[in-house]
Design a protein with these regions (language model features):
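Nucleotide and nucleotide-moiety/phosphate-recognizing core
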Residues: 5-161, 166-170, 176-183, 192-205, ...
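Short, charged/polar "capping" segments at the starts of alpha-helices
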Residues: 60-69, 271-274, 336-340, 353-358
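A charged, well-structured terminal subsegment
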Residues: 177-213, 368-381
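Extreme N-terminal, non-catalytic leader segments
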Residues: 203, 214-233
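Glycine-rich phosphate-binding P-loop
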Residues: 232-255
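N-terminal phosphate/diphosphate-binding loop that engages ATP/GTP or pyrophosphate donors
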Residues: 249-299
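Glycine-rich phosphate-binding loop used to anchor ATP phosphates in small-molecule kinases
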Residues: 296-334
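Phosphate/Mg2+-binding loops and adjacent switch elements
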Residues: 318-381
Length: 381
């Protein structure tokens, strides 16, 4: 995205002070692309000339969490830290870190602290757990604004995103009133005075990471984004789960949608060439345009990776018990209602309707359309 040097004055607030109760760890410190979610968002934010950039955080933000190109000089004043960067011919850029005056009040506490200390006509309010927000949609949000509105709220698939939205500075008084009444709903401050903009075509920008599952799915998306070709592995801890049949159904559906699918099969048998009704033959007949059979060997995982990345396709599906690449879908045996999986497993594929997990998404083996939709999400298709 190019810098927007002549856009209307606008300040940025990054909300990094939440309890992260569902994530069970501080979302602002989650590893993301060789840094953290907070550092990544700060780095991306400098494509836009914000009047003020403020981080709301109820912890100490270490200097190393601030990108090097921002961290040039700092001033500390009580619960506020300011970083000032002079861009040579550019204007100065200010980054401030503030803590809430009103504790345990959710996002409104951070909004009150920022708006009180740094008055601004407009604010872009962002939760820190939006790893794909690259600020390219800021001009569209500004274009939808009008004097009578207090907020511009993006809507994705019918769902409002008030923590990735544009607010007028005048909502500060509404925030104070809401806090005084112990009403901490963000919607309270823009209800009936907002314009809603459909951002469904840009849904990835608003994908947030509220849970361990969402974080793992986001990691899968960015991992595949950086690969020569996206990969999804379908695995099973035992035989007899029906994973090969499942894969052929997935290949058939993806092929019908116009995608070129590759298939890599990990096996402990020696390869003897093409064979009727073999797994690779079934994959080919289902629509796979490339297949590879990888036998056991000292560098099997590398061989699987090389085979997958050499295929000129839209997506590669890997079938394996132990050597698949991240992200993995684990197919459960018919009687199983749960599984431990591993750090690379993002979802369980089950025949039971009572399978639930806080660590993995769950998909039903007979719902091929939902399974294909999920695979496309992980593969950025």
């Amino acid at each position: 995205m190019k810098r927007h040097d002549k856009m209307p004055a606008l300040s940025l607030l990054i909300l990094a002070g939440g309890k992260s109760s569902r994530m069970k760890k501080d979302k602002s410190q989650l590893p993301w692309q060789d840094s953290t979610t907070l550092t990544h968002m700060l780095t991306n934010s400098y494509v836009y000339p914000f009047e003020h950039t403020v981080i709301s955080a109820n912890r100490i933000i270490e200097p190393q969490e601030i990108p090097d190109f921002i961290r040039q000089s700092s001033i500390q004043d009580g619960h506020t830290t300011e970083y000032i960067r002079n861009r040579g011919l550019d204007t100065e850029r200010h980054l401030a870190i503030v803590s809430d005056r009103y504790s345990d009040c959710g996002p409104l506490g951070g909004m009150e602290a920022a708006m009180r200390l740094y008055p601004s006509d407009r604010w872009l309010i962002l939760a820190v757990d939006l790893p794909f927000f690259d600020f390219s949609r800021v001009p569209a949000l500004l274009a939808a604004d009008a004097s009578e509105y207090d907020a511009v709220i993006p809507v994705v698939d019918g769902r409002e995103n008030p923590l990735a939205a544009l607010y007028k500075g005048r909502v500060y008084e509404k925030i104070r009133t809401a806090l005084a009444a112990d009403d901490y709903r963000v919607r309270k401050i823009y209800n009936k005075k907002a314009v809603f903009i459909d951002e469904t075509p840009y849904a990835r920008q608003y994908l947030n990471m509220n849970t361990p599952i969402a974080y793992k799915e986001a990691l899968a998306c960015v991992t595949n984004q950086n690969r020569p070709v996206p990969v999804v592995s379908i695995t099973a801890e035992t035989s007899g789960t029906g994973k090969t049949h499942l894969i052929t159904q997935v290949i058939k559906e993806l092929s019908a949608q116009g995608y070129r699918v590759g298939y890599v099969k990990s096996t402990h048998h020696m390869s003897t060439g093409p064979k009727r009704n073999s797994d690779t033959d079934l994959a080919t007949r289902a629509g796979a345009v490339c297949t590879a059979l990888i036998p056991d060997g000292p560098k099997k995982s590398r061989a699987i990776e090389d085979a997958a990345f050499s295929m000129s396709v839209d997506l590669v599906l890997i079938e394996s018990r132990r050597h698949g690449l991240f992200p993995k879908l684990l197919v459960l045996p018919p009687e199983a209602g749960a599984a431990e999986g591993d750090n690379e497993t993002v979802a369980l594929v089950t025949r039971r309707k009572d399978t639930n997990s806080v660590y993995f998404n769950t998909l039903h083996v007979d719902n091929i359309s939902a399974l294909v939709k999920y695979i496309k999400l992980l593969a950025n298709l």
